[in-house]
């Protein structure tokens, strides 16, 4: 049943990705690509980190795919923790009301994590002045690489459409320039969100 569910989800995502991309639909298309990667990589007993839980949508998508695993979520806003707990149906998760830059020392799970997801920017529907910043994000990426198992992956959605997001985008790309990573875009608009994937081999 688990495998059939994955196949069904992938088919739905493929249909969405095959549609003509417009800037208005860009965020949704990027999210579909993120979801595609999540489905492709996860196994039932995997350990996962949601480094920016926000309103919990990524965590809610991931948890049914890891019924024998565990998800660890991080966010500096208590509102995000509350919102996420409200929508999660599963119980195999632990949420921390602290910055993702503290995940290495908090979890002590080096070489154990299968997937880490970052959805940068601000909490949708909340105070837009509270945003992720490149310093803590880069530290979290560095620590995340240590936490990944030998086939682990990091997914980072970046939003360069606002000042702080553009700075974060530039700094992260500069940090990654000598590392193995891939960038997924579906528009030439430099302000549009895009996805970075980092694989550990």
Which residues does each predicted region cover?
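Conserved SAM-binding motif I beta-strand of class I
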Residues: 70-75
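Conserved SAM-binding loop of SAM-dependent methyltransferases across substrates and taxa
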Residues: 55-67
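S-adenosyl-L-methionine
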Residues: 2-46, 82-109
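Conserved beta-strand signature within the Rossmann-like core of class I S-adenosyl-L-methionine
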Residues: 151-158
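Conserved class I S-adenosyl-L-methionine
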Residues: 45-54
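Class I S-adenosyl-L-methionine
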Residues: 162-201
């Amino acid at each position: 049943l688990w495998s059939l569910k994955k196949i069904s989800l992938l088919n739905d995502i493929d249909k969405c990705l095959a549609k003509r991309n417009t800037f208005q639909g860009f965020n949704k298309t990027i999210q579909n690509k993120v979801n595609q990667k999540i489905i492709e990589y996860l196994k039932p007993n995997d350990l996962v980190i949601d480094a920016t839980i926000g309103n919990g949508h990524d965590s809610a998508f991931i948890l049914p795919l890891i019924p024998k695993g565990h998800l660890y979520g991080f966010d500096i806003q208590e509102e995000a923790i509350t919102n996420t707990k409200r929508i999660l149906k599963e119980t195999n998760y632990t949420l921390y009301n602290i910055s993702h830059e503290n995940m290495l020392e908090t979890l002590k799970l080096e070489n154990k994590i299968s997937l880490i997801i970052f959805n940068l920017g601000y909490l949708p529907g909340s105070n837009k002045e509270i945003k992720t910043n490149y310093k803590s994000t880069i530290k979290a990426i560095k620590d995340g690489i240590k936490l990944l198992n030998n086939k682990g992956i990091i997914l980072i959605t970046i939003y360069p459409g606002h000042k702080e997001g553009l700075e974060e985008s530039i700094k992260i790309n500069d940090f990654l320039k000598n590392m193995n990573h891939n960038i997924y875009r579906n528009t030439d608009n430099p302000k549009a969100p895009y996805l970075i994937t980092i694989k550990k081999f």
